[in-house]
Amino acid sequence: MDYQNTLTYLYNSVPMFQQVGGSAYKEGLENTRILDEHFGHPHRSFRTIHVAGTNGKGSCSHTLAAILQEAGYRVGLYTSPHLVDFRERIRINGQPIPEEYVVRFVEKERDFFEPLHPSFFELTTAIAFRYFADEKVDAAVIEVGLGGRLDCTNIIHPDLCLITNISFDHTQFLGDTLAKIAGEKAGIIKAGIPVVIGETTPETKPVFLQKAEEEKAPVIFAEDTMIQDYPGMKTELQGLYQIKNTRTILTALPLLQEAGYRIDEQSIRSGFAHVCELTGLMGRWQKLQDTPTLICDTGHNVGGISYIVEQLKQQTCRQLHIVIGMVNDKDISGVLALLPKDAAYYFTKACVKRALPEEELRALAAQAGLRGSCYPDVPAAVTAAQEKSHPEDFIFVGGSSFIVADLLANRDALDLH
């Protein structure tokens, strides 16, 4: 098999949550433990940092990896979902896993894993851990896929746990209250391992305190902590929500230093300033065009969209254009209720089975007082927005990671840079 055939095999043979939703979700760690034992417990050969949370965990994971890279470490980074290429999920010092490694792994191991019927994420996690061990990374930043307690990354024994925040997302699996969701994400807290909590609410803070007490784990709340100031520090990530992510990371760094990581001020400044360049991070308030301004962002739930709306309010423009698509298992009405009513809307859908048809999205949007036209795919919607916009206008593309993925996959055809 070549690389593309291998990906086709993976996408068709093992259920992928990003594509099909809940039918791909496997609760429990049984498969993960079997795979881990088969591959010789590879995660035990390198240090780890475990990152969970509803929003911001990708940005925090990439930034931590960038800082450690700049400090001279060989750093693995495991995140999800990918936007353009599967290999984005598994990186060492910013470089994606080689195509040849993915092909060899699947060819060599398929007879073992096929009878297990693993989920896509279970298998991808096994590939990542084996690759990091084979390549002898010093440390790896591991982002939780979904939840925490039963996520297949939760077999690691990290130096530090980090939980960014709690908002409503994946409620069909994690629970329908903030406290229940917090309980699932608090499941990554381990005995005696420090945990940093980025943001809390009155419903979630007691959950974290109780779990930390049960595990005798030191818990540090970023919002209550005095952090070291770095005057004039620049960050490559521009979204308003990055302010809280930055505080969370700066709270975590002294704990990593106490755990023996050698991280100096220059590494911290450089990691923040060049995170996208160092790690390949995309889709976080990312500018793709100057005239008119075109920004994309992967925010896709009420918590993430609320920050985006606040940032849109700060933009000075003649007319706001919003290209939006969503998947069918989100709080669609809750998101639409947040969006500005004076924008011109371009309703579309991503190329995934979970995508909400654009006509259904427009009907729901009309109930929220939003008006616009429908387009069959992201390139058509973005092209329409470009054609109808004035140089002093502002185009925003988002609503789903998959909308941003389709945009980035077509950026050359759309003449975006």
Question: What are the residue ranges of the model-derived segments?
Answer:
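Short functional linear segments
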Residues: 1-53, 60, 66-71
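ATP-dependent carboxylate-amine ligase catalytic core
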Residues: 22-29, 34-37, 41-44, 70-156, ...
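Short internal beta-strands
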Residues: 78, 194-199, 322-324, 343-351
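Extended acidic/charged loop-beta regions that coordinate divalent cations
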Residues: 81, 124-173, 205-234
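Nucleotide phosphate-binding/pyrophosphate-handling subdomain across enzymes
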Residues: 139-144, 152-162, 166-170, 180, ...
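Internal gly/pro-rich beta-alpha loop/helix module
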Residues: 173-180, 185-188, 193-254
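C-terminal helical cap/extension that packs against the catalytic core
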Residues: 200-220, 293-294, 302, 335-394
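Glycine/aspartate-rich loop-and-adjacent alpha/beta segment that forms the canonical ThDP
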Residues: 400-417
